[in-house]
């Protein structure tokens, strides 16, 4: 959609008016009730509007047990539209929803120490995907409206959520029932959206978090091996699936059709469920796009490289040899000034840079090394040792139990992890022996498309 498309713009403004009419308004806030239906998103089930307009008493209400979830997408969509159109009604409604979502009764964790006021800092105790969807809506509104309180709330809540699990590999349990030790893949998209947007907005520097997620849990949760998938299917417990609609169940080429989807419920080293919810594929796949978009930021003749991942763009191309080699080649097209963010694990004293083979002195601005007076066609190369490190980190694997994992990293990339679940009824992850032994990055020739227009507006 473009804003010069009048029919689309008229329809969106009508949608905003409809959302405003449907919202329950009180004082300076507004909300959409759960509705009393049989599904989490029981919006406007009849022409008489809501069956039940009662205001929620906690965040654990509704079939998803997540009151703030039911405001999340409306809040984000309204704020995004306001940013693009200047629609004051949309921004005002987003603000009212934000004030409802941030009410202290929806936040907090009883396990917090007495002196920690967790319900004012976005602390949570359940359903992290639903909470982060609400945080995404709050963040969008906070950035568009310049609401520092909303942005600060999101930052605090994000940092609290990532303290669960093993943040360094991008694993965080989703706590659907407040005791679940597994992670839902929907959260991968949430995490990448929050890390990229907060970093760009200057709310914090979370690029290393994004790098760890995309290189590890995101890459490993995508189902790509049909043999492992068939093994899981043959050994997993058999359950009867009721057919609610004619033709709803299909048994044709199921494994082949599943390749590329994202596993729903996983532990740090494997997928543990023979069932996949397709919400996870939709949300996780968008996370890939968020990370891809975040690799490069360009404006005029100034470009920032935020993530050392492969990316072609109209400004420059990034060729990353990580994790095999400590080498990144940037082929300049139009930039005069290139800023490259260096990951936290790189030893800055051993970082070297050259332009067209000639050494360059390093000039730092925070975590970025800056190169000025670049010319079209210049080849900028960064070289540094790849640090291999083995650490022991723990994650909850039962209602009370924790498992300590021995994890070997090359930079931010996991190349080995143990103990593993060797059961044939799981889909194993981190089968990365090739990353442990290879000293040269594998190469292949591909054709890449570069758009001259913005690809994403999210």
Regions found by a protein language model. Give the residues of each.
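Well-ordered alpha-helical scaffold segments within catalytic/enzyme domains
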Residues: 1-7, 72-88, 133-147, 189-203, ...
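N-terminal catalytic cores of secreted or lumenal carbohydrate-active enzymes
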Residues: 1-62, 66, 77-78, 82-85, ...
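Solvent-exposed loop and edge beta-strand segments that line ligand/cofactor-binding
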Residues: 1, 37-72, 106-140, 144-147, ...
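Catalytic-core region of carbohydrate-active enzymes that cleave or remodel glycosidic bonds
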Residues: 143-163, 179-226
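Beta-strand-rich binding/interaction modules
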Residues: 335-355
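C-terminal beta-rich recognition modules with glycine/proline-rich loops and embedded aromatic residues
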Residues: 94, 154, 207-223, 227-235, ...
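Solvent-exposed beta-strand/loop surfaces of large extracellular or lumenal domains
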Residues: 348-373, 390-397
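Long, well-ordered core segments of solenoidal/helical folds
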Residues: 11-29, 92-112, 149-170, 212-223
């Amino acid at each position: 959609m473009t804003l010069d498309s009048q029919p689309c713009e008229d329809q969106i403004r009508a949608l905003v008016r409809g959302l405003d009419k449907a919202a329950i308004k009180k004082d300076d806030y507004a909300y959409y009730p759960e509705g009393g239906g049989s599904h989490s998103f029981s919006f406007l089930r009849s022409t008489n509007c809501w069956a039940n307009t009662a205001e929620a008493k906690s965040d654990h209400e509704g079939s998803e047990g997540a009151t703030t979830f039911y405001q999340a997408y409306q809040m984000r969509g309204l704020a995004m539209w306001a940013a693009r159109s200047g629609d004051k009604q949309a921004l005002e409604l987003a603000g009212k929803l934000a004030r409802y979502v941030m009410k202290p009764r929806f936040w907090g964790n009883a396990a917090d120490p007495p002196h920690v006021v967790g319900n004012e800092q976005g602390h949570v105790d359940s359903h992290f995907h639903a909470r982060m969807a609400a945080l995404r809506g709050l963040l969008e509104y906070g950035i568009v409206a310049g609401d520092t309180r909303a942005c600060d709330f999101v930052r605090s809540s994000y940092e609290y959520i990532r303290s669960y699990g093993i943040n360094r590999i991008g694993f965080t349990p989703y706590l659907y029932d407040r005791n679940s030790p597994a992670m839902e893949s929907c959260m991968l998209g949430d995490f990448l959206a929050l890390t990229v947007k907060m970093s760009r907005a200057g709310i914090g520097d979370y690029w290393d978090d994004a790098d760890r997620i995309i290189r590890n849990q995101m890459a490993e949760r995508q189902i790509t091996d049909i043999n492992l998938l068939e093994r899981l299917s043959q050994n997993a417990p058999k359950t009867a699936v009721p057919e609610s609609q004619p033709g709803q169940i299909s048994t044709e080429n199921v494994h082949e059709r599943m390749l590329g989807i994202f596993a729903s419920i996983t532990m740090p080293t494997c997928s543990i469920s023979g069932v996949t919810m397709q919400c996870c594929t939709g949300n996780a796949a968008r996370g890939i796009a968020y990370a891809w978009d975040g690799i490069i930021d360009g404006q005029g003749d100034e470009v920032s490289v935020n993530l050392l991942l492969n990316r072609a763009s109209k400004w420059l191309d990034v060729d990353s040899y990580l994790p095999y080699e400590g080498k990144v080649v940037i082929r300049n097209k139009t930039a005069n000034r290139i800023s490259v963010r260096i990951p936290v694990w790189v030893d800055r004293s051993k970082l070297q840079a050259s332009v067209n083979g000639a050494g360059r002195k390093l000039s730092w601005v925070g975590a970025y090394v800056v190169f000025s007076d670049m010319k079209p066609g210049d080849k900028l190369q960064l070289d540094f040792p790849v640090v291999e490190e083995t650490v022991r980190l723990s994650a909850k694997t039962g209602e009370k139990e924790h498992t300590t994992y021995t994890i070997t990293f090359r930079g931010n990339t996991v190349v080995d992890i143990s103990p593993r679940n060797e059961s044939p009824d799981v889909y194993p992850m981190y089968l990365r022996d090739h990353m442990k032994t290879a000293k040269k990055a594998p190469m292949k020739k591909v054709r890449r498309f570069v758009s001259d227009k913005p690809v994403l507006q999210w």
